[in-house]
Amino acid sequence: MHIVQLANFYGPRSGGLRTALNHLGAGYVASGHRVTLVVPGRRYAVESLPTGVCRYSLPALQIPGTGGYRAVDPQRVRAVLRRLEPDRLEVSDRLTLRGMGVWARRNGVPSMVISHERLDRLLEQFLLPGAMARHVADAANRRMAASYDTVVCTTAFAHAEFERIAAPNVRRVPLGVDLATFAPSMRDSGWRRALASGADALIVHCGRLSPEKHVERSVDTVAELTESGARVRLVIAGDGPRRRALERRARGLPVTFLGFLAGRGEVARLLASADVSLAPGPHETFGLAALEALASGTPVVVSASSALREIVRPGCGAAVDDYAPAFASAVTGLLDSPEEIRRAAARARAEEFAWPTSVRGMLAALG
C-alpha cells in the first residue's frame, strides 16, 4: 500500500521527530510498502532517500523564534495529497496539520495521527493557567481524535490527555532506538579525556535548546555539583533559540557548548563517551535522545514529570523532581555505582525498544 507521512517542524536539525519519521518510513519500505514523506522546506523538491522513501519538500516560511522551523500551508499539503492518492495517511502534527484527518475522511483514506506532544502541558507552559489549559486542550483533542481513525500515543504519559476525554480510538505504540548506531562500543576514551578537560566525570545534555526542554536545569545541576566539590564537566550538544541565554547562565561553570552535531555517528560517540546523560524536559512524550543514551550504555537522569519516568528504571538512571538539587543528587548516586553494572543496565533497558517492533505496531495501527 502507499503510505503518506505528513509533518511540519521537520528539518535538518529537528531531532527526535525527524529520527522517528525516518526510521518508521524505512521500516514501512522494508515491509514492502510504498512511502512518501511530505515536509516543509525552503523550496519545492522531490528526492528519493537512501531508505527508499520518496520525500516531497514543500515551500514554507520560517516560524519566527523557533530557530529555523518551517510550517507548510495546509492548502499546499492537500493539493499534493490529491496527486499522491495515498492508501493510508500518517500525520505527525496535531497542531498546524490538524485538519488532515478531515481531508482523509472526505476522500476515503484511513488515517492515523501520532501524538508527539502533550497539548495541555504546552498550553500551560506558554499560554494559560493549568485548569484553563486542560479545558482548551480537552476540547481540541476531542475534535482532533474524532477526525482521525486512529490516534497513536507512544507512552502512558502521552495517552493520559486522551484518557481524560475517553477517546475510543487510541492505541499505544512505543517508538524505538537504533541499537546498531548507538552502542557502548562507540565510546572514545581519548575524546572523552579531551572533552572532560581534567574533570573526573563527563555529563552530557543532548537536544534542542528551546524553552520546553528546560536545558537551564542541566546547567544548574552542574552548578550544584561544582559547589559540592565534584569535578565534573557538562557538554551540551544541540542548538536553538535559548543558546545565548544558556551561555550567559553557564558563565564561569565547567560547561562546554558543542552546537548542533550533524552526524549521528558523532552523537553516538558523544553519548557513549559520557558518564551520565541529563534529560530535564518535563513535557517529553517519549524522549529519543534519552533512549539513545541508554543504548550507548550511559545512564540517564530524567524529569519525573515526563514520559521518561516510564522508560528509565533503577540501575540505568533515575527519574527525579524538577529542580537542580534532585538532579545533582541522582548524578552523584549514579557515579557512585559500579560503572560496568550501570552501563550494562542502561544498554539492556534500551534493547527492549527496537525499531522493527515499533514499525510492526504502527503498521497494525494503520490497518
Show which residues each predicted segment covers.
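Short hydrophobic beta-strand element within catalytic cores of glycosyltransferases
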Residues: 299-302
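Conserved donor-binding/catalytic core segment of Leloir-type glycosyltransferases
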Residues: 194-223
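Short alpha-helical donor nucleotide-sugar binding micro-motif in glycosyltransferases
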Residues: 145, 260, 269-274
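Membrane-proximal helix-turn-helix segments that form the acceptor-binding/catalytic region
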Residues: 119, 133-150
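Carbohydrate-associated surface elements
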Residues: 41, 157, 176
